[in-house]
UniProtKB/Swiss-Prot annotation:
Covalent S-S links between cysteines: 125-363
Function: Specifically methylates position 2 of adenine 2503 in 23S rRNA and position 2 of adenine 37 in tRNAs.
GO molecular function, a single term: tRNA binding
Reactions that this protein is recorded to catalyse: adenosine(2503) in 23S rRNA + 2 reduced [2Fe-2S]-[ferredoxin] + 2 S-adenosyl-L-methionine = 2-methyladenosine(2503) in 23S rRNA + 5'-deoxyadenosine + L-methionine + 2 oxidized [2Fe-2S]-[ferredoxin] + S-adenosyl-L-homocysteine; adenosine(37) in tRNA + 2 reduced [2Fe-2S]-[ferredoxin] + 2 S-adenosyl-L-methionine = 2-methyladenosine(37) in tRNA + 5'-deoxyadenosine + L-methionine + 2 oxidized [2Fe-2S]-[ferredoxin] + S-adenosyl-L-homocysteine
The enzyme's E.C. designation: 2.1.1.192
Family classification: Belongs to the radical SAM superfamily. RlmN family.
Further comment: Reaction proceeds by a ping-pong mechanism involving intermediate methylation of a conserved cysteine residue.
Protein name: Probable dual-specificity RNA methyltransferase RlmN
Signal peptide residues on this chain, from the entry's feature table: none
Cofactor note: Binds 1 [4Fe-4S] cluster. The cluster is coordinated with 3 cysteines and an exchangeable S-adenosyl-L-methionine.
GO cellular component: cytoplasm
Annotated binding of S-adenosyl-L-methionine, by residue: 187-188, 221, 244-246, 320
């Protein structure tokens, strides 16, 4: 294997200072919304009324809330329901089962989110940052660099829009209701900790305060920000933690996941096991299979030893192509042998379904490009 240049990364570095978007009702819980509507001279019940439209009926345009007086709708459009995401392009593939949306934010930043329909469920993949500062060399988002954190409402609004797409029947062969959310889009979710946790609370709060999703159907991915993992374990949440490991040894992980230069494999796994112990939730270990880089039998055996008898599941990801990448996905026989060795060690292992490749909507491909 050709050694890669180490890319220093500072996980504590702030995102570029940029004007955050105007406030939106999804930035607040129901009590906060009630305070806001009274400040606007409206009765408190308007907060529940508008929340029912937004979270219960998936209506994002105040003009469609026709049971509200026209003057109230105008006030709300300006103060509580500003446009946060302007659609640039929406693409579909997998016979209509996968949709990718490209959004322009108020400051011109671009982000993407993906909807994936299955016979028994509908999942959305949300972005938490515009770009990403983690600099993983095999990920298109990481190579683009970090622009800024998204607001709570910018995160939630992606889910509400895509839930509306599902409700419209546009996702072939799938239920009409959003059931799962994965924070695996653009950005490192735990580097935008407060807003991501607030967004999770909106997603799981019962309607009309939120979307009413199950906490157990929310997955938060991280490259391994150890203090944030421990902080998440202390929250009153039982979401699934997905750890983007990609290598079982520090020498290689320092190259593939530069934040490993700050927190080594042993430290990251220790935090993950603490999370599993506190929440009772199995940790998902994400591992991109890269030909001749991290797919050797001895690395499978080492990974198996690290994970044996732990509350963990390995999710192997066939490497998805990105522009200019020097790497390829591991051949299928190599992938099968990797799986065999992990299972022989007693580690639950599956290979991820590669959805959205045709539209650059698969894992590691989100780059928010406006070109064709």
């Amino acid at each position: 294997m050709t050694s890669l240049p180490l890319t220093p990364v500072n996980p504590d570095a702030p995102a570029r200072r940029a004007a955050m978007p105007p406030r939106h009702l999804a930035d607040f819980d129901l009590a906060g919304r009630q305070t806001l509507v009274t400040e606007l001279g409206e009765p408190r019940f308007r907060a529940r009324q508008v929340s029912t439209h937004y979270f219960g009926r998936l209506v994002r345009d105040p003009e469609q809330m026709t049971d509200l007086p026209a003057a109230t709708r105008e006030k709300l459009a300006d103060q509580l329901l500003p446009t946060l995401l302007t659609p640039v392009r929406e693409l579909a593939c997998d016979d209509g089962a996968t949709h990718k949306a490209l959004w322009r934010l108020h400051d011109g930043s671009l982000v993407e989110s993906v909807l994936m329909g299955y016979p028994d469920r509908v999942t959305v993949c949300l972005s938490s940052q515009a770009g990403c500062g983690m600099a993983c060399p095999f990920c298109a988002t990481g190579q683009a660099g970090l622009t800024r954190n998204l607001s709570t409402a910018e995160i939630v609004d992606q889910a509400v829009y895509l839930a509306g797409v599902a409700a419209s029947g546009a996702v072939a062969g799938s239920p009409p209701r959003l059931s799962r959310v994965v924070f695996m889009g653009m950005g490192e979710p735990l580097a935008n900790y407060n807003r991501v946790v607030a967004a999770i609370r909106r997603l799981v709060a019962p309607s009309p305060e939120g979307l009413g999703l199950s906490q157990r159907h929310i997955t938060v991915s991280t490259v391994g920000l150890v203090p944030a993992i421990r902080r998440l374990a202390s929250e009153d949440l039982s979401v699934t933690l997905a750890l983007s490991l990609h290598a079982p040894d520090d020498e290689l992980r320092d190259e593939l996941v530069p934040v490993n230069q700050r927190w080594k494999v042993s430290e990251v796994l220790e935090a993950a096991w603490e999370y599993a112990a506190r929440t009772g939730r199995r940790v998902s270990i994400e591992y991109a299979m890269i030909k001749d880089v991290n797919d050797q039998p001895w690395r499978a055996d080492l990974l198996g030893r690290l994970l044996a008898d732990r509350l963990a599941h390995v999710n192997l990801i066939p490497l998805n192509p990105t522009p200019g990448s020097r790497w390829d996905a591991s051949p299928k026989p190599v992938e099968r042998e990797f799986v065999r060795r992990l299972r022989a060690a007693g580690v639950s292992t599956t290979v991820r379904d590669t959805r959205g490749r045709e539209i650059d909507g698969a894992c590691g491909q989100l780059a928010a490009a406006e070109g064709p």
